Swiss-Prot record:
GO molecular function: ATP binding; ATP hydrolysis activity; DNA replication origin binding; lipid binding
Predominant location: cytoplasm
Name of the molecule in the record: Chromosomal replication initiator protein DnaA
GO biological process: DNA replication initiation; regulation of DNA replication
Gene that this sequence comes from: dnaA
General function of this protein: Plays an essential role in the initiation and regulation of chromosomal replication. ATP-DnaA binds to the origin of replication (oriC) to initiate formation of the DNA replication initiation complex once per cell cycle. Binds the DnaA box (a 9 base pair repeat at the origin) and separates the double-stranded (ds)DNA. Forms a right-handed helical filament on oriC DNA; dsDNA binds to the exterior of the filament while single-stranded (ss)DNA is stabiized in the filament's interior.
Region (Domain I, interacts with DnaA modulators): 1-91
Domain note: Domain I is involved in oligomerization and binding regulators, domain II is flexibile and of varying length in different bacteria, domain III forms the AAA+ region, while domain IV binds dsDNA.
Keyword annotations from UniProtKB, A to Z: ATP-binding, Cytoplasm, DNA replication, DNA-binding, Lipid-binding, Nucleotide-binding
């Protein structure tokens, strides 16, 4: 005599079959998601999704963190539901539960996230504040924009991201530190700020991949209120870092968080950076910091002397401002060097300053122009300067023209479009191609590399 109720047995068997069918369906859906979104996106967001159960037309999935749940719900849920319905018409909805995995980094994310955010960034330099920043025409827009971002609790429409660009030593990093200091010291706002270089962002990303803490990395960076990335040109050519930066950028913008980015050139001129990233970097306010004027350099020196509480004759300050034109770092370094002459009992005069800074002054006076580069390269290869501007594609002309473009990028502060215009109205893409060609030849052809080094000496 059987003690098993046939109806209960049949119901139990149906549930097993259904669960098995849905497990198979889920494996198929996972493959479809992988093919649909690609390896990087799948591994970043969808690989942690687990099938739990299904009943009464509802599928229950699980993820290890609340953050992943929210991201999937906003960005992928509609597609996942559609794929489920293609497999089983009875599925009406999907729910995601958060199930922390034991013995994994994801189980300690929420516990450590708050304190770890503070360890993400680089230390701030206490010297770099808005009060210590000398404003002039070349940096006025960048300063005003930076101050507005720092003082606003929420991102300002049209200023997110704030993108600052300019040559080395012109004040980009100073402004970024100033923004961070202002926010950190603001009594009214408790915003989490992270400032770091693009190089450190890449290093932390690689470390997270190696230690299998990638979800912790994602949560840390996506939980900040203000993310500031310095020298973003560093991610050029680094595909996986660019992919992660792209997703971090989008996540913060979607959450209405502020981004401040800096580079040594405008977004459109960032060679080796994906177009989709360059496009997003230009979404907000792009402010350039131009080369300093005499008046601005003199103002910087006067402010520095006041901070140092020391006396430097006005004619010496004017001499420095007139002759040290490369960047602010060199200008301040020159002032420090001249100031130290007083420690050995020498009087500070224009003559003593000129003697002390002989090498630096020589390099600053060596301002190389594109026209000079074209002339010297043309002479070296025994061609005409007009060949630099022509559209003739002879090999004997193309290579010297590319070399001249390469040196124009290396030795001048001109933008890529400006360089292209100086070579017969070519576009910036042509300049990029020329520079990459020369760089590749230098790496692969030792004789060519020697020739380039020989040419380089002509401009020193």
């Amino acid at each position: 005599m059987s003690l098993i109720n046939p109806k209960v047995s049949a119901m139990f068997f149906d549930q097993i079959v259904t669960a098995t069918d849905h497990n198979i369906a889920w494996e198929k859906i996972q493959n479809l998601l992988y093919n649909l979104y690609g390896e990087a996106t799948y591994n970043s967001w969808l690989s942690s999704l687990k099938f739990v159960s299904s009943s009464n037309g509802e599928v229950l999935l699980s993820v290890p963190t609340r953050f992943i749940k929210e991201w999937i719900t906003v960005h992928y849920m509609e597609k996942i539901l559609l794929l489920w319905q293609n497999e089983d018409k009875s599925i009406c909805s999907i729910d995601i539960q958060v199930t922390e995995e034991k013995n994994s980094s994801s189980s300690i994310i929420s516990k450590n996230k708050e304190e770890s955010v503070n360890n993400l960034g680089s230390p701030l330099d206490p010297r770099f504040t808005f009060d210590n920043f000398v404003v002039g025409k070349p940096n006025e827009l960048a300063f005003t924009a930076a101050k507005r971002v720092a003082e606003s609790i929420d991102p300002i429409p049209g200023s997110n991201p704030l993108f600052l660009y300019g040559g080395v030593g012109l004040g980009k990093t100073h402004l970024m530190h100033a923004i961070a200091w202002h926010i950190v010291n603001s009594p009214s706002a408790k915003r989490k700020v992270v400032y770091l270089s693009a190089e450190k962002f890449m290093y932390q990303y690689i470390t997270a991949l190696r230690s299998k803490d990638i979800m912790l990395f994602k949560e840390q960076f996506r939980s900040v209120d203000v993310l500031m990335v310095d020298d973003v040109q560093f991610i050029s050519g680094k595909d996986s870092t660019q992919e992660e930066f792209f997703h971090t950028f989008n996540a913060l913008i979607d959450q209405n968080k502020q981004l401040v980015i800096s580079a040594d050139r405008s977004p459109s001129d960032l060679d080796g950076v994906e177009e989709r990233i360059k496009s997003r970097l230009g979404w907000g306010l792009v402010a350039d910091i131009n080369e300093t004027t005499f008046e601005l350099r003199l103002g910087i020196l006067q402010a520095k002397v006041e901070q140092m509480n020391m006396y430097v004759p006005q004619d010496v300050l004017e001499f420095l401002a007139r002759n040290i034109r490369s960047n602010i770092r060199e200008l301040e370094g020159a002032l420090n060097k001249v100031a130290h002459t007083s420690l050995i009992g020498r009087s500070m005069t224009v003559e003593s300053a000129s003697e002390t800074l002989m090498d630096l002054l020589r390099s600053n006076h060596r301002s190389i122009t594109i026209a000079e580069i074209q002339k010297k390269i043309a002479e070296f290869f025994n061609i005409k300067v007009t060949d630099m501007h022509s559209n003739r594609r002879l090999r004997s002309l193309v290579r010297p023209r590319q070399i001249a473009m390469y040196f124009a990028k290396k030795f001048t502060h001109k933008s890529l479009p400006d360089i292209g215009r100086s070579f017969g109205g070519r576009d910036h893409a042509t300049v990029i191609h020329a520079v990459k060609q020369i760089e590749n030849f230098i790496k692969t052809d030792s004789e060519f590399a020697d020739e380039i080094n020989q040419l380089r000496k002509m401009f020193k």
